[in-house]
Design a protein with these regions (language model features):
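C-terminal nucleotide
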Residues: 1-7, 11-13, 18-19, 26, ...
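Residues at or immediately flanking beta-strands
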Residues: 78-80
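Low-complexity, intrinsically disordered segments with a bias for serine/threonine
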Residues: 128-130
Length: 383
């Protein structure tokens, strides 16, 4: 059996502004999606999900990863798959990215990874020319397979970068060519991530991402933001109201088209995101909280808050260093930075929300069990 897990995430700064090239900052949270896979004896490389036959059309994230990592053939073992999620779905907490990252890690651990003494490595990476967005299969591995080479198995085969780039490719595929890499990068690497269209001074650059979208080619620079050791918590308040991200993004786009002078508010949100990242780096959590509240006021001015969100924001404010909606708005969740997590969670619950308490910047993807790997040895046709 292989067991892999990945955390959810929440956006600290930069919602909506990131669509227009401004930076956004996200942190990994304690709540995780866990995936277990094991082989079963039914022939024909079939998959079962939660004990029933796998239907690709109903699970596009899993199917996209199957195409890239587990090509079905008579030699490929059949799998039983189980999913355990501590993240609410469609709440802006990165549940789909966590699912993709955890599943990519589980499949990689189960099949292993070939490497050689010259530094060649099977798989997908920001440093390789391979394209997980458009090239699910890797034919040029044939020579290496014939010539031998060392093989990494289980947790030793896992690469956070590969998990992140595969998850972004799957998100783009499912969302018809539109997907930011902030969710996939944050839940794969853990910690805190800043995404921008440009290199940001004073932060460690991680890698670049490119994506061909219906609107043209997009480029992002992904940075690591240090998270200080401090007795401070995030409390997430879930309104229970679902609001499609696309609808809220379109609302802001329509407003900016009608009132182009309001682009100044978008630029200001970007400035707040940079100040917030700098405050995190310096360990000034009071300043982080101030930036969060300022960000919320601007998002509210853009019309993406809701009565339900405002009710929870108001309830939590007295116990918070900072408070804001997180994600696209219109519903979903709000977050508060606090040194009093119990009182804050109780205030959110009394106001009608569902509370989640988490630390900031938890660990990213990991393998929790890798017994009896590899499940099979891919041949040339399976790679």
């Amino acid at each position: 059996m292989v067991v892999a897990s990945a955390p959810g995430k929440c956006i600290l700064f930069g919602e909506h502004a990131v669509v227009y090239g401004e930076p956004a900052v996200a942190v990994a949270i304690d709540q995780r999606v866990t995936i277990s896979i094991k082989t079963h004896q039914k022939p024909g490389a079939t998959w079962k999900l939660e004990g029933v036959p796998f239907i690709a059309e109903k699970h596009p994230h899993l199917e996209g990863l199957r195409k890239r990592l587990w090509h079905l053939s008579e030699q490929t073992p059949s799998l039983d798959i189980a999913i355990n999620s501590k993240l609410p779905s469609a709440a802006g907490l990165g549940s789909s990215a966590a699912l993709s990252v955890a599943f990519s890690a589980a499949l990689r651990a189960a099949r292993g990874r070939r490497v050689d003494e010259k530094g060649w490595c099977e798989g997908f990476s920001s440093e390789l020319k391979t394209d997980p967005y458009n090239e699910p299969r890797r034919g040029h591995e044939a020579g290496f397979i014939r010539n031998g080479g060392r093989r990494l198995l289980g947790k030793d085969a896992i690469d956070e970068d590969e998990c992140a780039i595969l998850a972004h490719a799957i998100e783009a595929e499912v969302q018809k060519g539109r997907a930011s890499p902030i969710d996939s990068s944050t839940v794969s690497h853990g910690g805190c991530t800043l995404l921008s269209d440009d290199f940001e001074k004073g932060l460690d650059w991680r890698y670049s991402r490119q994506l061909s979208t219906p609107e043209g080619k997009r480029n992002w620079e992904v940075h690591d933001v240090p998270v200080p050791q401090d007795d401070v918590w995030l409390v997430i308040g879930n309104t229970g109201k679902y609001s499609p991200t696309g609808k809220m993004v379109e609302r802001v786009a329509s407003m900016l088209a009608a009132e182009p002078e309001r682009m100044n508010e978008i630029i200001t949100i970007g400035s707040i995101a940079r100040r917030g990242a700098d405050a995190l780096k310096k360990g000034n959590m009071e300043a982080v909280g101030i930036c969060m509240t300022e960000n919320h006021l601007l998002l509210r001015g853009l019309g993406v808050s809701s009565p339900e969100l405002e009710n929870l924001v108001k309830a939590a404010a007295n116990y918070s260093l900072g408070v804001k909606l997180t994600g696209s708005g219109g519903g979903g969740c709000m977050i508060t930075l606090t040194r009093e997590p119990k009182q804050t969670a109780e205030a959110i619950e009394l106001a009608g929300g569902r509370s989640i308490v988490t630390s900031l910047g938890t660990s990213g993807v990991r393998i929790d069990d890798d017994e009896n790997v590899p499940f099979w040895t891919p041949g040339v046709a399976d790679s």
